[in-house]
Amino acid sequence: MSCADSIAKLLVDAHFSCYFSKVCPSALDCAEPIVVVEGAFSRDSRLAEEERGSVVVTVLVVREVMADAESVALAAELAVRRADWEPYADAGSCRIVGIDTAAPAFKERDSSGRYVWAFDVTCMVVRSL
């Protein structure tokens, strides 16, 4: 399990029941997905048994209508920000100890003409060595 998987599980539990994946699917496969993409681990400090750092996870909300993309992105960011993280803290080789979210913003229109809104979730993590 990864930080992206933890965030996707949280969103599913918050009733955002769209398609989650690491790449944006074709409009034929899923017309209005929420895509969760994980960035690389960035180490802040290293201790004898563990290292601490951060992982940025980008949440992309894809919708046919601009207003829908915006409202779902705002609701998803709010759900992530207000969530009790304890049930979702275990992310496989690392543990999420805190999160910070950025405000959702319009990103682009994809090749199918759908509107994409995005927000970043910075996960502060501890991972064992």
Q: What residue spans do the PLM features occupy?
A:
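Small/polar-rich, solvent-exposed N-terminal microdomains that initiate assembly or binding
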Residues: M1-E49, S71, A83-C94
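Oligomerization/assembly interface segments of phage tail-like spikes and tubes
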Residues: E51-A69, L74, Y115-V125
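Bilobed periplasmic-binding protein/Venus flytrap-like ligand-binding cleft at the lobe interface
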Residues: A75-V80
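Acidic-leaning, charged glycine-interspersed low-complexity segments
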Residues: R81-S128
